[in-house]
Amino acid sequence: MHKVLTELRDREILKDISNEEKFLSLPKNSGVYVGFDPTADSLHLGNYVQIVNLIRFKKHNWNALAVLGGATGMIGDPSFRSTERVLLSTEELLKNKNKIKSQLESFGLKVFDNYEIYKDISFLDFLKNIGKLINVSYMLAKDSVKDRLAQGLSFTEFSYQIIQGYDFLHLYQNQDIFVQYGGSDQWGNITTGIEMISKVVGDNHKAIAITANLLTDSNGNKFGKSTGGGNLWLDAQKTKPFDMYQFLINQPDSEVEKLLKWLTFLEISEIKDLVNKHNKNPKDRLAQKALAYEVIKDIHGKSAAENCTFLSEMLFNLSLDLSKVTLENMEFAYNQIESFEVEKGVNLVNFLVENKILQSKRLAREFIASKSLKFNYEPIDEDFSVSSNYFEGKYATLHLGKKKILICKVK
């Protein structure tokens, strides 16, 4: 049992544990769970931190369970929020649940929907049998609740911690789940579950709360937001893998070792060696490249990670050997960065101007004069007609100046 705790400490992830002595005495194959509310139709990079840690438990032979918040998602967690969440419609919640369940299962995790606990419990039975297990004064003492009282807190949101707490009791009694794990902002909700368990089972219960430090960026904001402030989604249709790759490869040197420890399964010794090599020549961004590759590989697969690595090189290497680039690389690139379709044989400069890819022929001539208008890395002139000798004639690269590259699909 101690091995997973040692790993969480070595990776500087562990924040709090309610009773370490009790944790170390738990039987083999004990269960641990993390909750994921279906507030959107995809999980995001911030959620991925907890997915990775749940997988760490699984690798250490724990019975790891992802709890899908079909019930809690109907209410919305008020913890440390300044405003009440907008409630989801039944149809939207169902759609979100199905997609998130598939995402969690894609990581090899077992998934349990907490709606199954409550679907046959009447409101009066809930008050009679569950509500009596917790005191209002105990709930009001939670920082996550106190912070909202001044702004107003509905009974709906106030009851969230009762449901999350009862989840823990139910899983403890029915599935031998003795540990609930979550971010440090979940401490109040998790310990509510332990309070309920102690009321039912007694003080000799085995329930443990474990929380992780919140992963933040260099500005102290929650990690996983794009430059524009939006979430970086795990769904490739919502966030392109290459956009996530670029986000990771642009992380500052001051953060990259922490991110390698938190977001990858590389051994600590590997990470230290990698960071030492990186520090000898930081401009090569060796650590950031490893971070981006590992995370994309674990989320989207090895092929996507290799294609992202290629695409990054293509964007920033002005002398790339196209003979080493595959058709699969180009098909991937076409769907990841700015691209367009063009018919074989047409005058390329005219096409670019007519389709507003270049603003004017004057600008085209400036690029041509500086040899920075390139088709498949070769400078072209104003009379060039589209034809690609690479990638089975189906794709080509187009450089507009020194910093912009597009992918052409040749029809």
From Swiss-Prot:
Chief localization: cytoplasm
Enzyme class: ligase
Location in the cell: Cytoplasm
Location of the motif 'HIGH' region: 38-47
Protein's GO biological process: tyrosyl-tRNA aminoacylation
Chain positions of motif 'KMSKS' region: 222-226
Keyword Transmembrane in record: no
Keyword set, alphabetical order: Aminoacyl-tRNA synthetase, ATP-binding, Cytoplasm, Ligase, Nucleotide-binding, Protein biosynthesis, RNA-binding
EC number: 6.1.1.1
Superkingdom, taxonomy of origin: Bacteria
Entry's Gene Ontology cellular component terms: cytosol
One GO MF term attached to the UniProt entry: tyrosine-tRNA ligase activity
Catalytic reaction(s) noted: tRNA(Tyr) + L-tyrosine + ATP = L-tyrosyl-tRNA(Tyr) + AMP + diphosphate + H(+)
A Pfam family it matches: tRNA-synt_1b
InterPro entries: aa-tRNA-synth_I_CS, aa-tRNA-synth_Ic, Rossmann-like_a/b/a_fold, S4_RNA-bd_sf, SYY-like_C, Tyr-tRNA-ligase, Tyr-tRNA-ligase_bac-type, Tyr-tRNA-ligase_bac_1
Residues reported to bind L-tyrosine: 33, 160, 164
Protein biosynthesis in keyword set: yes
S4 RNA-binding domain sequence ranges: 346-410
UniProt binding sites for ATP: 225
Record-linked NCBIfam families: tyrS
UniProt cross-references to HAMAP family, sorted A to Z: Tyr_tRNA_synth_type1
Subunit structure: Homodimer.
Family the entry assigns: Belongs to the class-I aminoacyl-tRNA synthetase family. TyrS type 1 subfamily.
UniProt function note: Catalyzes the attachment of tyrosine to tRNA(Tyr) in a two-step reaction: tyrosine is first activated by ATP to form Tyr-AMP and then transferred to the acceptor end of tRNA(Tyr).
Protein name: Tyrosine--tRNA ligase
Lineage per the UniProt record: Bacteria, Bacillati, Mycoplasmatota, Mycoplasmoidales, Metamycoplasmataceae
